[in-house]
Amino acid sequence: MLNININKIAKDGYIYSKNIRLAKSKIDKQKCYDVREACSIIKEISFAKFNETVDIAIKLGVNPNHSNQVVRGVAAMPSGTGKTVKVAVICQEEKLDEFKTTGADIVGSLDIIEAIKSGNIDYDVYITTPAMMVAVSQVARILGPKGLMPNPKLGTVTNDVADVVKKVKSGQVEFKVDKAGNIHAGIGKISFSIDEIIANINAFVSAIIKSKPSEAKGAYLKGIYLSTTMGPSVRLDISSFTEISNERR
């Protein structure tokens, strides 16, 4: 029988509500904040007892229902992501010894594909070579819904395996616009310095700009919001990004 402490749950709920109200009171919802000020605020109001993820949400002026306006890609995080990423490489048998020196957590061939079929999906990123894509396609229905299927557009189907493993391990974030035209991603940890968070924000926004579909008309970036796992969001002043300011001129 479960031993549930109702009083503790109620107390924890009260503390959370109190903390979130206090955090919200420090944010002017009518204001668009400079990126440095926004980073300072989210660090100040962070109240969770764990190292929260710093999240970014971007509203785009695209129609994702049109296939030529789907925004998708990867952004390299200069400050890293604060996460340990487990990487699996699926390659031809004759490439096993070569790719075992890349720093991947596991390097295999058909054995990894069979493990996936059995439900053993123990890695955060799967990388493969073009020559193995026919074999890997056998598990597309398993990896695809989890966002783990190797994809040439994301750089995870490549012959330059060593370079991609290095980039993934050093910290990069995948992004894809949702049906409402929004992109959400975790771009670091609240324990990062303000300068480290800013560097990641700039890199992420720059990657979004570079991924702008030529068919998208009107304002592309409509809103950028910063928050932590448990905290309220802070709206950023889009003009505070040099890349965006240059694009608008």
Swiss-Prot record:
Species this chain originates from: Orientia tsutsugamushi (strain Ikeda) (Rickettsia tsutsugamushi)
PANTHER family noted in UniProt: 54S RIBOSOMAL PROTEIN L1, MITOCHONDRIAL, LARGE RIBOSOMAL SUBUNIT PROTEIN UL1M
GO terms (BP aspect): regulation of translation; translation
Any one GO MF annotation of this record: structural constituent of ribosome
Pfam families hit by this protein: Ribosomal_L1 (PF00687)
UniProt superkingdom: Bacteria
Family: Belongs to the universal ribosomal protein uL1 family.
GO cellular component: large ribosomal subunit
Name assigned to this protein: Large ribosomal subunit protein uL1
Its job: Binds directly to 23S rRNA. The L1 stalk is quite mobile in the ribosome, and is involved in E site tRNA release. Protein L1 is also a translational repressor protein, it controls the translation of the L11 operon by binding to its mRNA.
Subunit structure: Part of the 50S ribosomal subunit.
Keywords, comma-separated and alphabetical: Repressor, Ribonucleoprotein, Ribosomal protein, RNA-binding, rRNA-binding, Translation regulation, tRNA-binding
UniProt keyword annotation of tRNA-binding present: yes
